[in-house]
């Protein structure tokens, strides 16, 4: 029944909304500096890799029986077991206050709250939220609209599924060497990532052939794969350690807000410009990406875009 599906989906959403910022907050709690950037990258890589594997396995199981894909929802049992181990680890470390006190003091010194009584630099947090929302909105064109564009050019649904899988694999890839990427690009990291996304969207838009759509999807994914974990790391610098999870929750909220609003915004703009072209989302998001690229490049020395590792 539809109401049962809605309830189950809502419960899954609530669970994810609680778990994701809490688990990400653990990274900010136990790691600082370059190691924190590396861990955020690995976390992002593992998350996106798991997404690709789960999607592939679910598709295979669905061919056997429609009941089997729901076995995926048993995977959180592994997380429950790991949480028990984490609880034991925390109780062990609580016995050693000297080692525990070192990291928070470093974190507190690194966090600039702008004198806020809430323990969070509100202006910096809002900048991160806006930027994360915009970049997520940009890449949603690949997730939501690529299959329709490829259908228009007479590609099969299997081909579009392959392209989207490559996109998620590309998001995963930078996570394994994120610290090295940031160390090389420094304050130009986000600008060059946006440039990669812009080139990717342009390739998808202008080329109705697989051999240009494939690198297009990969370039968009690579750019987003760098930006996403770097924004999580940047968020931890806006808040005191005890407020980091709350700040991360606000930032991650923009991801889901962008997903929620994207179809309505694109539909509204298509009606406004009297077009139902399948290329429109890619052209519109390409323009947003170009504008955001110049913003990131010209403001590369500001808090939001300066990613020099310390």
Regions picked out by a protein language model, each given a short descriptive name:
Residues 124-165, 171:
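Extracytoplasmic gate region of multi-pass secondary transporters
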Residues 3-11, 211-219:
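Paired small-residue
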Residues 33-34, 42-85:
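Helix-loop-helix hairpin linking two adjacent transmembrane segments in secondary transporters
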Residues 69-84, 280-297:
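Symmetry-related core transmembrane helices of the 12-TM Major Facilitator Superfamily/SLC fold
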Residues 88-128:
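Juxtamembrane intracellular "pre-TM" segments in multi-pass secondary transporters
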Residues 173-186, 270:
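Helix-to-loop junctions at the C-terminal end of transmembrane segments
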Residues 238-274:
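A late C-terminal transmembrane helix in Major Facilitator Superfamily
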Residues 8-47:
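Cytoplasmic helix-loop-helix junction between adjacent transmembrane helices
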């Amino acid at each position: 029944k539809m109401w049962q599906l809605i309830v189950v989906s809502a419960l899954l959403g609530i669970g994810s909304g609680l778990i994701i910022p809490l688990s990400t907050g653990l990274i900010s709690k136990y790691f600082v500096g370059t190691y924190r950037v590396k861990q955020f990258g690995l976390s992002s890589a593992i998350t996106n890799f798991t997404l690709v594997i789960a999607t592939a396995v679910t598709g295979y199981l669905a061919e056997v029986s429609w009941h089997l894909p729901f076995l995926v929802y048993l995977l959180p049992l592994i997380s429950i077991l790991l949480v028990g181990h984490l609880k034991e680890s925390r109780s062990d470390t609580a016995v050693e206050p000297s080692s525990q006190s070192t990291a928070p003091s470093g974190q507190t010194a690194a966090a600039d709250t702008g004198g806020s009584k809430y323990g969070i630099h509100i202006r910096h947090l809002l900048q991160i939220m806006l930027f994360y929302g915009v970049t997520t909105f940009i890449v949603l064109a690949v997730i939501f609209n690529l299959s329709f564009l490829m259908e228009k050019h007479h590609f099969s649904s299997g081909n579009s599924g392959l392209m989207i899988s490559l996109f998620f694999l590309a998001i995963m890839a930078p996570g394994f060497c994120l610290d090295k990427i940031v160390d090389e690009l420094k304050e130009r990291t986000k600008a060059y990532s946006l440039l990669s996304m812009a080139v990717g969207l342009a390739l998808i838009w202008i080329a109705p052939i697989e051999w240009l759509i494939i690198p297009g999807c990969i370039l968009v994914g690579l750019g987003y794969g760098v930006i996403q974990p770097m924004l999580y790391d940047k968020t931890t610098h806006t808040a005191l350690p005890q407020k980091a999870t709350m700040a991360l929750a606000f930032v991650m909220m923009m991801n889901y807000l962008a997903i929620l609003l994207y179809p309505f915004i694109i539909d509204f703009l298509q009606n406004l410009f009297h077009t139902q072209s399948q290329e429109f989302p890619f052209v519109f998001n390409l323009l947003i990406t170009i504008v955001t690229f110049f913003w990131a490049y010209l403001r590369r020395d500001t808090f939001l875009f300066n990613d020099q590792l310390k």
